[in-house]
């Protein structure tokens, strides 16, 4: 018997505002594909403008998954993302379509493509109970700060109010001497799928100009009102509100900064995030990069995916 054929998956990654959305939809049309969002914040309902969520009009009939699946007050983990996306990949493949993952949250996408294990097994019960007691007595921020000291990568990813996951990350460091983020990286081995991993990049100054313009457009589209709606619903200290585009405007509503300062900070944070995204993808993943400074290079990228995954597009039939 021959070996089991792995499912084919196309992945489009790149920094915020580089042009992933339009390209992915054009590719889905050409390759008989369906799109899975690889963005950890587009999962939240009513958080549309600040997450640059794809609109119904932009979808143009192409099915999209992992969008609008949680309420803003809900927590969401990498493990749940991994489980849901792998299920979507199976189902899309069974329908004879090509799964196309699109996004910018590196760890989330990595967790799907590689054999990452997320377990709550073992550990140090006494240490865990000590941390739980500390969280009760001194507050969740105190315990989260302890995590920041030993594993800043995990602390950035896990909200302080998600006490169970904060303590789990501390427990892993306490029992193994390794960061949770390092453990996940060590698990990285063979890809689970037959993957075409495409990265979009462009001239940095042009990208930063696009990011600044995008923030201005978001404000014109009603980002302030969108965030105000969440604020008025009493949504505080949630994982969702840590998203860029929300935490800055929350500072305005809590009278910490002026609106002008909030928008300026949003632009700065968005540019920094784009830089971090590019660094992550270049350091952690084997990506074939396409510079889209002069245009989106649809035909070139399409030919690459066809060759890598041995597909025929609708354009070539």
Name each model-derived stretch.
Residues 1-317:
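Phosphate/pyrophosphate-binding catalytic cores of soluble transferases and nucleic-acid-acting enzymes
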């Amino acid at each position: 018997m021959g070996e089991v054929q792995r499912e084919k998956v196309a992945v489009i990654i790149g920094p915020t505002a580089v042009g992933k959305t339009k390209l992915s939809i054009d590719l889905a049309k050409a390759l008989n594909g369906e799109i899975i969002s690889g963005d950890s914040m587009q999962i939240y309902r009513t958080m549309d403008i600040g997450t640059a969520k794809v609109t119904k009009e932009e979808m143009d009939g192409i099915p999209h998954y992992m969008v609008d699946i949680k309420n803003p007050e809900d927590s969401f983990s990498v493990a749940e993302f991994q489980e849901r996306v792998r299920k979507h990949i199976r189902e899309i493949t069974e329908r004879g379509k090509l799964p196309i993952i699109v996004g910018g949250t590196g760890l989330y996408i990595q967790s799907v493509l590689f054999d990452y294990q997320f377990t709550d097994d073992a550990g140090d019960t006494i240490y865990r109970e000590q941390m739980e007691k500390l969280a009760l007595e001194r507050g969740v921020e105190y315990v989260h700060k302890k995590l920041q000291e030993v594993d800043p990568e995990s602390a950035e990813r896990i909200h302080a109010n998600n006490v169970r996951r904060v303590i789990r990350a501390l427990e892993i460091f306490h029992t193994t001497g390794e960061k949770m983020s390092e453990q996940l990286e060590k698990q990285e081995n063979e890809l689970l799928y037959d993957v075409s991993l495409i990265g979009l990049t462009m001239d940095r100054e042009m990208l930063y100009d696009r990011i600044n313009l995008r923030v201005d457009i978001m404000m014109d589209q009603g980002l302030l009102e969108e965030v105000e709606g969440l604020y008025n619903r009493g949504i505080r200290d949630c994982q969702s509100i840590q998203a860029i585009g929300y935490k800055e405007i929350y500072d305005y509503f809590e009278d910490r900064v002026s609106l002008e300062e909030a928008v300026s900070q949003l632009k700065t944070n968005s540019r920094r995030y784009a830089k971090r995204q590019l660094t992550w993808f270049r350091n952690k993943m084997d990506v074939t990069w396409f510079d889209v400074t002069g245009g989106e290079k649809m035909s070139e990228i399409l030919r690459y995916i066809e060759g890598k995954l041995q597909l025929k597009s609708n354009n070539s039939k």
